[in-house]
């Protein structure tokens, strides 16, 4: 589970990732923007949400990268993911990794249908 709560007006916001540890206990950790910034550095300051800017782009890329582990796929889909989700979030939000994976799978299916239509 990923979640965020606005803590300041403007500026970077923390995003939290809740995972189940090897012993079954839930652990909450901060999502690090650095891996996504190494792919595309939209926002050197970090994450934001609720509008269509650079901070939300960084968050969309980071979420996709963290969930899928696929840098190419994450780069290709992050702007659409931002527009569909991140830009619409209010003061607080939460999203399960499974929801993100379902969205990715749906996008990949839709893209496959489009390319099949072009080939015919």
Residues covered by each model-derived region:
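Short, compact, well-ordered microdomains
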Residues: 67-111
């Amino acid at each position: 589970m990923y979640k965020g709560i606005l803590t300041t007006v403007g500026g970077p916001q923390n995003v939290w990732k809740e995972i189940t540890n090897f012993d079954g206990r839930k652990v909450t950790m901060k999502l690090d923007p650095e891996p996504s910034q190494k792919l595309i550095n939209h926002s050197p300051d970090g994450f934001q949400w609720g509008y269509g800017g650079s901070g939300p782009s960084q968050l969309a890329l980071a979420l996709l990268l963290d969930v899928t582990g696929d840098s190419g796929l994450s780069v290709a889909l992050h702007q659409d993911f931002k527009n569909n989700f991140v830009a619409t979030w209010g003061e607080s939000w939460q999203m399960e990794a499974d929801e993100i994976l379902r969205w990715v799978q749906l996008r990949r299916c839709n893209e496959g249908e489009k390319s099949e239509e072009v080939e015919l």
